[in-house]
């Protein structure tokens, strides 16, 4: 089929299958694939048929090739709907680049100064929110000939399009979010939770948001690899087999105790059972710091649900990880939204064979949020818990697994007890036994200022023999027999005393004998 200059070709005429959206490229050598618009700009004639509108992009008659759907290959990662504004990589290289993440990480004072330097008036800046300042800075940058790059987690809305949400903003919708078109989502097989990095363009007339122009990477890898990934639900779950080493410094007794008596592996589903004021937040911080120090290959996310704002700030400054939060003054729908985005993001990374750890504080408050937002079923359990409300929190917690095909998702969640709320007790009972590792904190130990306030007798890991060596297992079994007749307070005091005298756990186990512990 020959196409003359200016001819608009319909989808039916090209023989396209229904569902291939936004593009069919025609070339005189019949060698062009989907995604090569900008490579031919100004030299040949390309005719593109999109769902939204038809347009001719270049200047010469071309031959149309009908291709089967499976043969399509994506060579250029641009948005077909923006083909006429797409720039070559050579054009982009010589222009000023600006990364949105650099702006979102700035404090308000620094961002205001930066905006004023870019030509935005001081009077306008002082009354704007942070997201609005970023929006105007970006718009000013593009008007001056610069290019913008952005990254974020994709949230696909029911209408088929999506937005890149910023983790610095805890995935809250804002005016600086990046629009991702339905054609791009279908073209690259994108899902909610995908971490996308690429070039964006400023809003056109009548548009409110910046839009994705060219996708560079998906989940920190090339776009081509997205087509080969296996869905998370189709991956094979296994028991954890690789230990997360939590031992850092000699004086960090908490993580040393966990390393011995309740080791955590990649893919662990761990529950920290904690009454109020037993040091669970400090314990979570120490776990997070140990993981970032000993396992830089692990992607760590700290998810704080219904927490106090000052605790969020403390966690952000203490832990070198991605901290996502929804404080107690937010609505329950907000708690649910960020929990689901974080889970989807973790799943996408596991599909790319990465190791992910989520520290959740707390699963009790997440279950409370679901209880408020789920439609009532008419069946109410003791404490006011709806029978359907715990399904999604269980699905969140149950997503933790070691994957046979590669990668793992570890979830370490806290469960609140002894709060005086019957609902919290019911939620804990529902989650009791669902994990494969449990740490019990004891209020009596914390009242005596004994930290870590861990009840050694009640804490442990299923299949710990997969994480420990044979020698370690034998010595720990002997140690448990020795301390079994003791009170919890005596056990913790003994462990603190003996561990402080040894450099690490290996030296502690070597020096261990019944005579030493009886002295």
Curated annotation (Swiss-Prot):
Q: Which GO terms describe its molecular function?
A: ATP binding; ATP hydrolysis activity; ATP-dependent activity, acting on RNA; helicase activity; RNA binding
Its EC number(s): 3.6.4.-
Q: Where is the Rho RNA-BD domain?
A: 147-222
Question: A Pfam family name for this chain?
Answer: ATP-synt_ab
A biological process (GO) of this protein is:
DNA-templated transcription termination
Binding-site residues for ATP, renumbered to this chain: 265-270, 277-282, 308
Q: Which UniProt keywords apply?
A: ATP-binding, Helicase, Hydrolase, Nucleotide-binding, RNA-binding, Transcription, Transcription regulation, Transcription termination
What SUPFAM superfamilies does its record include?
A: Nucleic acid-binding proteins, P-loop containing nucleoside triphosphate hydrolases
HAMAP family, per the entry: Rho
- What role is this protein assigned? Facilitates transcription termination by a mechanism that involves Rho binding to the nascent RNA, activation of Rho's RNA-dependent ATPase activity, and release of the mRNA from the DNA template.
The entry sums up its family as follows: Belongs to the Rho family.
Quaternary structure annotation from Swiss-Prot or TrEMBL: Homohexamer. The homohexamer assembles into an open ring structure.
Q: What is this protein called?
A: Transcription termination factor Rho
Query: What organism, scientifically named, is this protein from?
Result: Treponema pallidum (strain Nichols)
Taxonomic lineage from the root: Bacteria, Pseudomonadati, Spirochaetota, Spirochaetia, Spirochaetales
Q: Which gene encodes it?
A: rho
């Amino acid at each position: 089929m020959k196409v003359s200059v200016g001819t608009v070709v319909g989808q039916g005429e090209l023989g396209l299958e229904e569902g291939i959206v936004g593009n069919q490229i025609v070339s005189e050598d019949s060698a062009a694939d989907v995604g090569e618009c900008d490579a031919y700009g100004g030299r040949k004639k390309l005719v593109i048929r999109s769902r939204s509108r038809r347009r001719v992009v270049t200047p010469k008659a071309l031959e149309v090739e009908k291709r089967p759907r499976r043969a399509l290959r994506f060579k250029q990662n641009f948005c077909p709907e923006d083909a006429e504004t797409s720039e070559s990589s050579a054009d982009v290289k010589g222009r000023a680049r600006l990364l949105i993440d650099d702006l979102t990480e700035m404090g308000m004072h620094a961002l205001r100064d930066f905006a004023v330097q870019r030509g935005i008036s001081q009077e306008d800046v002082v009354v704007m929110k942070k997201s609005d300042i970023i929006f105007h800075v970006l718009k000013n940058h593009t008007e001056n000939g610069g290019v913008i790059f952005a990254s974020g987690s994709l949230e696909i809305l029911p209408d088929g399009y999506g937005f890149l949400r910023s983790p610095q903003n805890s995935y809250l919708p804002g005016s600086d979010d990046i629009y991702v078109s339905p054609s791009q989502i279908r073209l690259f097989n994108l899902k909610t939770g995908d971490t996308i990095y690429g070039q964006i363009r400023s809003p056109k007339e009548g548009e409110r948001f910046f839009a994705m122009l060219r996708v560079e990477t998906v989940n920190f890898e090339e776009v081509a690899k997205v087509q080969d990934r296996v869905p998370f639900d189709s991956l094979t779950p296994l028991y954890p087999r690789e230990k997360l080493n939590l031992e850092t410094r000699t004086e960090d007794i908490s993580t040393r105790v966990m390393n011995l008596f309740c080791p955590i592996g990649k893919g662990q589903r761990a529950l920290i059972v904690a009454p109020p004021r037993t040091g669970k937040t400090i314990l979570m911080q120490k776990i997070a710091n140990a993981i970032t120090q000993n396992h830089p290959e692990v992607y760590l996310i700290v998810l704080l649900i219904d927490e106090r704002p000052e605790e969020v700030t403390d966690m952000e400054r203490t832990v070198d990880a991605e901290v996502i939060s929804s404080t107690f003054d937010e609505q329950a729908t907000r708690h649910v939204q960020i929990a689901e985005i974080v889970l989807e993001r973790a799943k996408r990374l596991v599909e790319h064979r990465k190791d992910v750890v989520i520290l959740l504080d707390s699963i009790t408050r997440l279950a409370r949020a679901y209880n408020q937002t789920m439609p009532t079923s008419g069946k109410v359990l003791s404490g006011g818990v709806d029978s359907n409300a715990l399904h999604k929190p269980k699905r969140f917690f149950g997503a933790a697994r070691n994957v046979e095909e590669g990668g793992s998702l570890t979830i370490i969640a806290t469960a609140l007890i002894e709060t005086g709320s019957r609902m919290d007790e019911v939620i804990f009972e529902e989650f009791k036994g669902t994990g494969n590792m449990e740490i019990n904190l004891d209020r009596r130990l914390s009242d005596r200022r004994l930290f870590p306030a861990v009840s050694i007798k009640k804490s442990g890991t299923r299949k710990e023999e997969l994480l420990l060596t044979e020698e370690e297992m034998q010595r720990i079994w002997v140690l448990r027999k020795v301390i079994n007749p003791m009170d919890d307070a005596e056990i913790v005091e003994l462990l603190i005393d003996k561990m402080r005298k040894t450099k690490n756990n290996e030296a502690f186990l070597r020096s261990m004998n019944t005579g030493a512990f009886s002295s």
